[in-house]
Amino acid sequence: MSAGALAAVVGVCLGAGAGVVPAAAVPAAGPAPAATKAAVPQGLESFYGQKVEWYDCAATGGMEKSADKTGFQCAKVTVPLDYSHPDGQTIEIAMKKHLATGSTRQGALFANPGGPGYSGVDMVENNETQFSPTVNQAYDIIGFDPRGVGSSTAITCDDGAGQQPAGAAQGGMGVDDPLPGSLIADAVGDDPTPFRDAQDPAADGGAEGNISFPTLIDEITKDFKQEEANCAAHTKPAGLLDHVDTVSVARDLDVLRALSGDQKLNYLGFSYGTYLGAIYADLFPANTGRMVLDGAVDPTLSLGGRAAGQAKGFETSLRTYVEQCQSGQAVQEGQGCPLTGDADAGVQQIRALITSADQTPLKTADPNVTVDGRTIRSVVRRFLYSSEYWPLLTYALDQAITQKDGSYVQVLYGRATAGSSTPTFYAVNCQDIPVQGDVTSWEKEYRQNLQSSPTFGASLSNQDARCQAWGHSGTREPAPIHAKGAAPILVVGTTGDPATPYAWAQALAEQLESGQLLTWEGDGHTAYGRSGPCIHDAVDAYLTSGTVPEPGLTCKSGQ
């Protein structure tokens, strides 16, 4: 969630209808109160009581040991594969912590970057861009790879070039890896979306009626069954694909909390990480400390409901981008916008580019690589996450439209997709939300998504079909999460968030018994780390002193 190299977004705090108010308007709760010793769930005593062997590890490069004092320490701990059978198979969870830089350590702050399927180990390596100096001084910041991911016991699939743990970085910058660097390498702040473009061409095929809907579903089913068989053949232990649900991850997180020495979990979760945090607070309200959920997921939504919300969100964000491009805001110095006319015309020009590239892919600087419409659509959608990087998207579109050259689109696509893991993403989501509907209802949803989002509706649809084909399904029906008895939970929502629409943050804050909504009137996905001092100060104040923002606090950008 880097603030970015292209723009610094300055926020001004406004109370709802009450003029300017300070970010910390409610009396501070002071240091985290001494807590009674957290209870250990029956049968899990050996896991909660295990000894953690922390070792010095490299500042970058995952869990690699270091002979130097880098300020980072790593460890792996053991948890049950199946919490209903704790005496059975076990798996490992990898942790990496950045030691508090201040003299008065307040404990540990656990963080999750989203996904599902993204690495908290990688996230904490970027602590200086992910977390403020205030938070770095106060806390040991611990990132962990959830079960099924990265350096933990991971879902492993053969990508055709040898076995790879799902979520393992393939080089370049992962979509949840806002590491400072060149403008290209820093192009995408994060992409922890509940739904992303599927890897199979059939996900987009048929959007213009090229094939029948039942044929589209047949193709999706075939592809996802093949992918599941591939992953099942390479993943060990064999039962892992049935135990990567978020409830299990939340139970792992409580083990990690206990092993850190804290009686309360302090937590910062982004996007999917908000769902994990809410599940944790519901399971362990007495163990919940200071929790911030940024870019919230509404737990009442079905797979289809989430997809529909995102389809509308991305289409709205696309129009906002076009307006800023045409007004000269989303361009680099000395560059023009290739999108002519009004916003409607500009959106149509992007759609026309996608359609044209599907028919005749664009050449690139590499004679062996071309760029099709699906790649362009994916780049456009991914770069809508971070408005500070819209000038890079403009440059890529300008090259593609005016020169028929997809070179820069391909560069951005490679950066945006490095380290992504479609199998883990579906393995988790399909276990979290049961399949609903049938081919008839899916086609209705598909047509509705095409209507509300002509640009992205097709690629975001048919999530239930994919999960049905994947075959590892959950039974936990979508329902409100209340987390009764938990400490205050700060829910941060961005009004122009395409991936987790603002309405989702409103819904989660309303559902949580102790939820409080903090609003950023900005564009892009999530707010903390990429908005401005209003949001940052409010979040930091809560995490470090327990100060809850004024109810209804809204932070405006650009003032």
Per-range role (PLM):
Residues 119, 251, 269-281:
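Glycine-rich nucleophile elbow surrounding the catalytic serine of serine-hydrolase chemistry
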Residues 250-264:
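Conserved acidic catalytic loop of the alpha/beta-hydrolase fold
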Residues 498-503:
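Conserved alpha/beta-hydrolase "acid-adjacent" motif
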Residues 521-527:
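Histidine-bearing beta->alpha loop at or near hydrolase active sites
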